[in-house]
Amino acid sequence: MSRLREEILGEESGEDCHVIDLMGFSDEILLHILSYVPSTDLILNVKRACRKLATLCLDKSLTHAVVLHKDYQVSKDKVKQLLKEIGKEILQLNMAGCYWLPSSTIDHVLRCKNLVKLNLSGCHLTSLRLSKMLSVLQNLRSLAIDVNPGFDASQLSSECKATLSRVLELKQTLYTPSYGVVPCCTSLEKLLLYFEILDRSREGFILSGQLMVGESNVPHYQNLRVFYARLAPGYVNQEVVRLYLAVLSDRTPENLHVFLISAPGSFAETGATKNLLDSMARNVCLDALQLPKSWLNGFSLLQHVKFNNPFYFSFSRCTLSGSYLVQKVINGGKDLKSLTSLNLSGCIHCLAPDSFFRKAEDDIDSSILESLVVSCCNLRHLNLSAAHHHSSENLGKHLCQLLARLKHLLSLALPVCSITGGAANADKPPMQSVTNMLPQGFGKKARVGVQTYPRNVEQGHAKPQSSVFWTLLESLLLLESLELVGSNFSSAMPRNEPAIRNSLPACSRAQHVGDTEVAAISQLTYLRNLTLAQLPNILTGSGLIRIGAQCQHLRTLSLANLGMMGKVVYLPAFMDMLKYCKHLRDLRLEQPYFSANAQFFQALSHCSSLQRLCIISRNGTLQSDAVMSFMASCLEVIMCHMFTGESLTACKNLQQSIVRSFQAERPALNVVIFPLLHEDLTEVIRDVPMMHLDEITLFKSRVAEEPPNLWW
């Protein structure tokens, strides 16, 4: 490291080689380079290389904020040494998701006496350790923790409570019915609550939504500006969140400007919640709003609520009509230039004049979408998934053509059926451009019934003249996240329930979306996250190869139910795609009859940066020796989740072999291999670290799921 340098070779014309010594760069350039180095490597390795680096690595710009989140190689000893060397300099410490570190690691946070922000979500933390730590961190203003079974607020010392009384921001994930530390936080301005409480204990007992005996029931919300609650499925979560909301219904904070409740399924409105909503409509001016669908379906709140400069709306799964959306929410297009994130997922009538006498599959009213696009011209994140948004033949008024005006979009979620042509084209039988798929050569004929594809990327799909989807993506060159999900798609692996054995057929218009449309995605140079689900007309997967070759920033890939269900016809092309994915970190693959054999894992081994792998295949098979070889060759893999049709014995043996062989070298290794249709699946899932479960194992739409930068 003392002679960091880069050799720049001359061209074949015989130019001399030039040697650039990186130590000759300015401090500003070197600091920028070092900002990309993980904190542990920076302090424990790079700092020791030479005197200049030793000085630069201790620069405040590098030591004030330390991020250990997703630093999967960090160990207890490394954390101890890191905090020993620079603990006094750290103002922000993010250890979110460090589930593999023992609870004793938290003791070393005591060295960071000047901490202002601390994130311990997903870390093992007891009431006593929390008390001891917070008693020392008197400057703390932002805190994120988990509240697990056994948490006892009575064990918190007076010094700890004094620190909590000064905390302004709290993020709390609840795994047990409790207020946690909320009653102690008397100055709260931002409160984020994640309810992950199961309805049954491990022993099978039904849990109650009542809080533990002795807990204060008076949270202090008077200074609250941001309230966010996200509920996992389950009755207990709903009961507990009502207790948190009860205080809000008595007196709504005057400065409240963000109010978000994300609740799956049915979450009935009560008298208390109705009083809360009425109070909000009278007394506050909001900038962000999300409510359970049953609370919104009456629309009474939206008629009276006042908005200031709204930046986030989520009306996910509600029956909001397009006319109401234009008239009441976007105010005829006058006031929503500030809106940057909009979630209309599952709003099946949001682009139609009304919801009466209308089928979900009927064509949309393009004038409503046009009003939305004009009014919300600065949108960065838009979710229109889980609905049938079919366009008519009106020239220039197709959904894709209208969305192409949103030049600032960074993330977009669309139903597959929305990107096809108008109704006239939809009535034609689906066709793939076979000539585009075949390799060029003398006398090479296509075998009947066997699809082939071009192995040379340059021979891929040319832009069809009439493709509105190609035109859309040509206009969205900044797009980083794209989701194309079938309107009727449901994952075989839902939350807290047995696996789903059957799924609804794809929308008839989705039958016209195939390899050519998938190839259009390759235009997105900056694409980082891609989800494709329920595209039944994928014949060869040739479009995937172009994506792999041209989208070199791709980090997360999720594929589900592509092509025919009985056979993975796109597998050869997919394996060719993987050879290009050198920077891919997360891969989720859901396909009913997927054979994870040696060929597949050999191709996957080209993904040298891969960290997390999840395979879900109801009738799928595994080749154990191929899995072991893959794990040995891909040294970064720390999560391996496979839910297939293999026997319980075979799954357990493979899981034990992986853990036994690689756990010592990979402290964060999390392995779950289990039969998908086994009755104990939900019990196995509950032990998966929430970070992996939420980000990759469970399928969901993530575009505009919550406001951007909700937490630091």
Task: Provide a role label for each language-model segment.
Residues 1-10, 15-16, 29, 77, ...:
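C-terminal capping region of solenoid repeat domains
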Residues 27, 42-60:
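Short helix-loop-helix/strand-helix junction enriched in hydrophobic and basic residues
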Residues 36, 65:
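Core nucleic-acid recognition elements
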Residues 55, 67-119, 123:
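F-box-proximal linker/hinge
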Residues 109, 117, 121-125, 133-136, ...:
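Alpha-helical bundle protein-protein interaction modules that mediate dimerization/oligomerization
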